[in-house]
Structures are given as structure tokens and as C-alpha cells.
Amino acid sequence: MVLKTELCRFSGQKIYPGRGIRFIRSDSQVFLFLNSKCKRYFHNKLKPSKLCWTAMYRKQHKKDAAQEAVKRRRRATKKPYSRSIVGATLEVIQKKRAEKPEVRDAAREAALREIKERIKKTKDEKKAKKVEYASKQQKSQVKGNIPKSAAPKAAKMGGGGGRR
């Protein structure tokens, strides 16, 4: 017999039939929580990514590395197949594959050189505009007009976060 399990919207844990608390928001969105603890934390607007027992925290901090590796290994075993890609026929792809590495490297270097030149050109244009703008600003500025320094920021209030 297969049980239909659902996931808690806060903790990410499995909820078996007959368990959990269903919450329907005023915009008709349905939330299913594992227990009152998850529901309470959700309503208090606590972030599940900051609570070390939730699935989101564990995923962000790479705690379930062994399970992830198993999943990746399963996904990696795909059967090879030859099929043309949009914009390139199978013959073109095979021709590129059969191409010598020296020719491929030369083409890549040429493309990189062109891109670098384009970037350098745009940077030079930006510099020229910046210099032009700065010179206009200096001309328009009156001698007695000195910009005020920014007011110092007030210290932040509140706790430092930490574990809950």
C-alpha cells in the first residue's frame, strides 16, 4: 500500500495522511504545516532558512551531502544519443568534433580577442563621457558652493539573530 505524503510548507518534512494543519490564506493560497510549531513560526514570519532543523537550512548549508551525491550519480547515467541541435545540423556538429584542436584554439582566441577589443572600446567611450561630464560639472559649480558631507548613520537596533 502506498501512502500519499505531502511536504510541510515551512519545514519541508513529509506529512503523512491524518497529520498536519491546513491553513488557507485570504488570497486562497493553501499551506500545509507538519505541526503547530511550524504553523506558529510561519505566522511569526520566521525564515525557515535560519532555523537549523528545517530542510531549507540543511540544503543551504550542504548538510545532506551524501544524499545529494547519490541523486547526482543516478541522474548522471543517461544513454547517449546523437541528434541535431536547433541551428546546427548533425553534419556540422560532427565536422566541428573532427576538427583539430589547434584550429579550434585559434578560432577561440580570435573570438576572445574580438570580444576584448569590443569591451575596451566601450570602456574608453565611458571614460570619455565621464571626463566630459566632470568638466561640465566643474564649470557649472560656483566657488562658494561646497557639497555637504553625508550625515553619520545611526546605530542599528535589534538583536544579532543567532540560533532559535
Swiss-Prot record:
InterPro entries: L24e/L24_sf (IPR038630), Ribosomal_eL24 (IPR056366), Ribosomal_eL24-rel_N (IPR000988), Ribosomal_eL24_CS (IPR023442), TRASH_dom (IPR011017). Residues 117-164 are annotated as: Disordered. GO terms for cellular component: cytosolic large ribosomal subunit; endoplasmic reticulum. Residues 117-133 have a biased composition (Basic and acidic residues). GO terms for molecular function: mRNA binding; structural constituent of ribosome. Pfam families: Ribosomal_L24e (PF01246). SMART domains: TRASH. The keyword Ribosomal protein applies. Keywords: Ribonucleoprotein, Ribosomal protein. It comes from the Eukaryota. Belongs to the eukaryotic ribosomal protein eL24 family. Interacts with the cauliflower mosaic virus transactivator TAV to form a TAV/60S complex. Interacts with REIL1 AND REIL2. Might have an extraribosomal function in reinitiation of translation. This is Large ribosomal subunit protein eL24z. It comes from Arabidopsis thaliana (Mouse-ear cress).
